[in-house]
């Protein structure tokens, strides 16, 4: 291994003294500029005195080690034990870890507190751990935008010989269609062939560099790192020399990366044979690479075949997981022959691990570090590249043999997914543990041994303990070093005092595990605490946090009382009270998706942290008493109650603000310091957000006599496009009433609506009177009735109201001349058996039908039809609404909830009642909406254009459904 590789290995192992010496030595060989950044980082680490040199742990004394550590070292011959000694230790360990956590008392509770506002909607959670769509929307909501200084793509092409194939790949890069700048860095791993000649051939066609290292054998990671250090742009791509990119490859990668620089992009691949084609042919025909037939390969040990061609083995998984969005371990599909990402991630996770000096595994290990630090992975079709198969269909790398070597390294360094829970007899100390228990320690010399020992004496042994001494003024650090300084499962750091939040951030950052457990320095765990939580994580990879409950004990361990236990988790309850008590474990990935512990507050630090975690992933609560909370009078949780209370309400409101909940404040109910009674108060600007046109006078237009009522079910995407579509085809519209979820009413959308109003002089009324927590079978009907009530308050001179759909599209001009021929446009059809069964199960409505029609046979009554595109004379609409309100009141009085879509039947029912009461049969026709049998499919642009021309659309139809606007 060369000096630079040794330096990187030492740095990644936290041996910064050795790393600094080796980087200084590397500077003599490679030049100061190449390693200057690493030298600075080493000096920063050393100056903080926040680590313990690995040299101090070389000498292992078995007498000072916990039992599990002795057994683990013995399993791999690093500690010599006789068989009797080993059996004795096993029996002691089983005795120590044999105690099981007690069940906590469970009581029935409301999952959502009764006083939690119905219209307070918390931000959505991701569908899975790699939900890049959720993350992108979250950053947009928080106003987080990427800051790029040097936009462009640096393409790193590692190569060893294979000049002919490299020639073709460079030719395909010449053919790129993009306005973005890019450079090519050919990184040579000591080739015997003269690659410089190939590179010089393209100096006039590409911005190209050539860097080379001596042939030390298979050093793919080292040569990748060499190329990456040479890169000048903010974004980098790694492209194997045999991967020929399609023409929009650069453009596709950069377009996505500029939108989100916290994502790794992965390109799929196809296998082609180019050995009878020259680079000049590709230069002369940019489409040639994409036109080649797919072929078979013997290169990849994991290849999938279909007939006579080989397929990218990842394609099926890409399809199943929505391009990895729903994948629990996307780094396993991070094949570095064709990827792109922001260069700043190298500063966050480090470089490729140069210990991998055989084929395979290095990309998985690097990808895992990206994943653990909070990076997202996404496959894009625009990243397609064509794998050029060498003559004979095999290359010079012995891949199968290499994989057998590197897989062992992967299992040592990638605990998540690649690690199983094993009995202690079959376990050893891994270089990267599965679990880290972190302990912030300050002046706790009297308690720290019991605390640390409880973490080491867990039934799960794939575990480390990370202790951060936060500038203790007693002998805490001395005790820790004496007891655990030589323990390979304990890592110790020390820093100047900064408070519990600072120590927690330092300790979690110091931890190596994927699953992180929190333990206060004066408390201690039950032996199965980690195992109970870990099993939940392993069952459900979408969990961000698992927590148990605790008991309060005296310093001597005697019971005071069991701790407070809320038996079931809900985000709404956590928003009102800290229910996520010790013992708590979370994933390091989830933690990195937050900004960590808040070092600006002294109390409510944990509450703030777990509110943040609850915003990025699911929680699971276990009703087990796994944690012993020692009360000795100096606990931070029972001191400074006034500050605690203040910060309690501060952190909840900060959580609501992060989730863009702007209509409520979480306020204290009384002035008692020990009280956490609360009240949700509506914010002062709440009505201003909704009634954005309150200061704008209604614009009266002589020929405008139509109102349109629309219900938006959730997001307001495409709202302004919808408004423009309405007025383009309907010149007689006076006002549009939108029932919306105000949580999606952003300042940008409000601005667009105001601009629309000012430009077109069309009145817009926003309404949100109906709670979006209402049963979804009734909500749309209530929303339209509420819209009509808002209109009535304005006393407008209207002739008709149209009930439009948020995702429909007008396609023909002048619906007004059509609808004014009729009183009402509704669809009337017979009820299916499914509808009849649901109505019969809804006794209030069934009784009304019997009352007015004296007929139990619902098949004889035609009153079913989609409400989209329905229109009614304005005066009749209010009569119909009055009847419908009576139906709703009756349902509410009996607390009976319908199981059918009321908007598709209650309008028709009310009209039939009105005709029966008045004895007048109104002039009726069908709705304005055309909904073909394939209505659940989205309309294509071609279908829309065809519909605008009136092709295949009935002459009396003016709206089509459903459109993505």
Swiss-Prot record:
Keywords: Cell membrane, Glycosyltransferase, Manganese, Membrane, Metal-binding, Multifunctional enzyme, Repeat, Transferase. The keyword Oxidoreductase does not apply. UDP-alpha-D-glucuronate binds at residues 442, 470, 518-521, 582, 604-605. Its EC number is 2.4.1.175, 2.4.1.226. It is a peripheral membrane protein. Mn(2+) 2 binds at residues 522, 632. PANTHER family: GLYCOSYLTRANSFERASE, SLR2126 PROTEIN. Belongs to the glycosyltransferase 2 family. CS/HAS subfamily. This is Chondroitin synthase. The gene is fcbD.
